[in-house]
Regions:
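Short hydrophobic beta-strand that contains or immediately precedes a catalytic carboxylate
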Residues: 4-5, 186, 230
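DNA-contacting surface of Y-family translesion DNA polymerases
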Residues: 232-291
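Amphipathic, charged-and-aliphatic alpha-helical interface segments
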Residues: 96-100, 213-248, 268
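Residues that scaffold, gate, or flank divalent-cation-dependent active/transport sites
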Residues: 1-149, 153, 270
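Short, conserved phosphate-binding/catalytic loop or strand-edge motifs used
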Residues: 149-155, 190-195
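Long, highly charged, low-complexity intrinsically disordered interaction regions
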Residues: 164-225
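Generic non-transmembrane alpha-helical segments
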Residues: 132, 136-140, 171-180, 237, ...
Length: 291
């Protein structure tokens, strides 16, 4: 089987590995305009090269007063008039009841959840931790593809029997939590894209392994918009035809065939009959295009 690994609330979870007091709290990681780029103040800048899933980027390390760290974090988003600026780029599951979403303006998020803890993003730290996890996974999974900073694909064929896959990914999930203190969800199926779809179904900290003959029934009611590779263009067309679920789309292959090879490939992925390989990220042809 092929597996998809997706770290749960990665940026927040990463911060909790170094600040354990954040666990079970209402936490967001936020981003504001980077005033450090043109600042004359001393800072530590690091240029990150192309490391697989990431492009070169300039990052700055921040140093905070440990005795008053919550105030120091919030001050990162204050302008000279004391107004808060920034947007939420990640939030803990504890924030869900308050309606806070990725992209919510920080000022609104604080109004929605007055006891909110705000953390400035530290992408250098997130990348370093992601690379440590990748190095560990390369010892556990024979073929590994890093899809993003917090997602991986793996191919277990010839390594783990299909009947043993569920036990393997359960153990792997628990090992990652014990070693890195990072919660992760893992899905497994014959297709990497079905595995990715399944991961979203069992978050957070879940595992699922689904044989091909059970794919159609398990995923029949999932929205077509939730499938990897279904972009706004095809989504609008399917909506015009009143196609809302994967089961409905599987019965109308011609709607995707009209997009040529890309559409045919997408239809096979939706059916779980594609043969897309798990490949090292250095071969960027492994990315799935949206239509």
């Amino acid at each position: 089987m092929k597996i998809h690994l997706d770290l749960d609330c990665y940026f927040v979870s990463a911060e909790r590995t170094r600040y354990p007091f954040l666990k079970d709290k209402n936490v967001v990681v936020a981003k504001s305009s980077d005033k450090k780029i043109f600042s004359k103040d001393k800072k530590q800048g690091v240029i990150l090269g192309d490391t697989g899933a990431f492009n070169s980027v300039l990052e700055f390390r921040n140093h905070y007063d440990a005795n008053n760290i919550l105030k120091a974090w919030r001050d990162e988003f204050l302008d000279e008039n004391g107004e808060i600026h920034g947007i939420v780029i990640a939030k803990s599951y504890e924030c869900k009841p308050y309606g806070i979403k990725t992209g919510t303006p920080l000022r609104e998020a604080i109004y929605m959840c007055p006891n909110l803890i705000i953390i400035p993003s530290d992408h250098l730290f997130y990348q370093e931790l992601s690379q440590k996890l990748k190095a560990y996974l390369e010892f556990k999974i024979p073929v590994l593809e890093q899809y993003s900073i917090d997602e991986f694909f793996g191919d277990l064929n010839g390594w783990i029997k299909d009947s043993d896959t569920l036990d393997f990914i359960k153990d792997l999930r628990d090992e990652i939590k014990a070693k890195f203190d990072l919660p992760i969800t893992i899905g497994a199926s014959c297709s990497k894209w079905i595995a990715k779809l399944l991961t979203d179904c069992v978050k957070p900290f879940g595992v699922i392994a689904l044989e091909q003959e059970k794919v159609f029934d398990y995923t029949k009611d999932i929205s077509v918009d939730d499938f990897p590779g279904v972009g706004s263009a095809i989504g609008k067309k399917l909506s015009d035809y009143r196609i809302q679920t994967l089961a409905q789309l599987r019965e109308r292959p011609n709607l995707l065939y009209a997009y040529g090879k890309t559409g045919r490939d997408l239809y096979e992925r939706i059916c779980g009959t594609d043969n897309d390989k798990v490949i090292p990220y250095s071969d960027r042809s492994g990315m799935t295009p949206k239509i």
